[in-house]
């Protein structure tokens, strides 16, 4: 066998052994981190910042839409399509101006 096959086989066996070892470990033995400050029946305990205990009268971040109507947000409807008549008229005006420029430099 070539060295590459031996190396690949060794890596496969080592990976398998590592997976078996990790899966056999008991992961639930560790200490569970809780949130004691979020329990509703406990009184507020902020001695340094008593204002943190009282609910604020004004929201921390007031609502903003994110963009104004003039900038046409993604959720707004797209602009109305240009009619064929307007496209033809605009092309004729452009062609006439271009031809006038070419004829009279």
From Swiss-Prot:
It comes from the Eukaryota. Residues 1-30 form the signal peptide. Pfam families: RALF (PF05498). Its main location: secreted. The keyword Metal-binding does not apply. InterPro entries: RALF. Disulfide bonds join 44-53, 67-73. One of its GO terms (biological process) is calcium-mediated signaling. One of its GO terms (molecular function) is hormone activity. It is found in: Secreted. One of its GO terms (cellular component) is apoplast. Keywords: Disulfide bond, Hormone, Secreted, Signal. Expressed in seeds and rosettes. Cell signaling peptide that may regulate plant stress, growth, and development. Mediates a rapid alkalinization of extracellular space by mediating a transient increase in the cytoplasmic Ca(2+) concentration leading to a calcium-dependent signaling events through a cell surface receptor and a concomitant activation of some intracellular mitogen-activated protein kinases. Belongs to the plant rapid alkalinization factor (RALF) family. PANTHER family: PROTEIN RALF-LIKE 15-RELATED (PTHR34270), PROTEIN RALF-LIKE 16-RELATED (PTHR34270:SF3). This is Protein RALF-like 21.
């Amino acid at each position: 066998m070539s060295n590459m096959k031996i190396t690949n086989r060794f890596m496969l066996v080592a990976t398998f052994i590592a997976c078996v070892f990790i899966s056999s470990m008991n992961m639930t033995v560790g200490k569970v981190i809780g949130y004691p400050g979020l329990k509703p029946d406990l009184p507020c305990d902020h001695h340094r910042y008593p204002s943190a205990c009282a609910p604020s009268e004004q929201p921390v971040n007031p609502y903003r839409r994110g963009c104004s109507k003039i900038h046409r947000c993604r959720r707004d409807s797209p602009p109305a399509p240009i009619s064929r008549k307007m496209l033809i008229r605009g092309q004729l005006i452009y062609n006439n101006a271009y031809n006038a420029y070419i004829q009279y430099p």
